[in-house]
Amino acid sequence: MNYAFRNGKILDGTKEMKIQQGLCILVENGIITDLIPDANADLHNYKVIDLHGQYILPGLINMHVHLAGNGKPQKKQRDNEKLVKTIMSSSLTRTIAYKMVAGFAKDELFSGVTTIRTVGGLGNFDTRLRDEIESGTKLGPGILAANQGISVPGGHMAGSVAVAASTIPDALKQLEKAKQEKVDLIKLMITGGVLFC
């Protein structure tokens, strides 16, 4: 379907980002195809959306997401490795965790983020959710998915959103698993995470 968004305040995402008005955004098959003066717009082939002076901008991209968490700082230190083992140990807790992951992805979409890149997650949740969003059975942003990252023993996030590989054959096994899960990228978590307080 073709859409024409008119009567809005356009933020174009450029460095200067000055509000533009009096323009109509044309979208064909989900792709922005043109930005034309609103007054002269021939819109008979478009479904017209009147923005009534509201703001519109291109979708944002979040390039570093762990859907296993909501992004809020932890109030206290916890044993993430133990927590993940507990979550992944039964069908019930995996189902609950997956619903939470899907909810966190939906939160991203509702905040204006239309694409996310996941860089470490629980099992195959990220590719599973990506596929459900693409098929239209779940609501969320487009996902470039890594599923679990690959780390080393004692490495960053090893045992939680990354799998520790002790040897080259271990690492190759994890790469093969990622290939079977049809990930979009491989996340390596070899060094310790850098946190500034």
Predicted regions, residues:
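Conserved residues at the C-terminal ends of beta-strands
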Residues: 11, 119, 189
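Glycine/Thr-rich phosphate-binding loops of Rossmann-like dinucleotide-binding domains
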Residues: 35-36, 70-71, 126, 153, ...
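Divalent metal-coordination and catalytic microenvironments
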Residues: 8, 25, 30, 53, ...
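Metal-coordinating catalytic core of metallo-dependent amide/deamination hydrolases
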Residues: 137-197
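Short amphipathic alpha-helices and their capping/turn segments at secondary-structure boundaries
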Residues: 44-55, 126-137, 170-182
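Metal-associated gating/positioning segment near the N- to mid-region
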Residues: 55-132
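N-terminal metal-binding scaffold of metallo-dependent hydrolase/deaminase domains
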Residues: 1-43, 56-57
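Conserved beta-strand scaffold positions in the cores of enzyme catalytic domains, especially
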Residues: 4, 46-50, 145
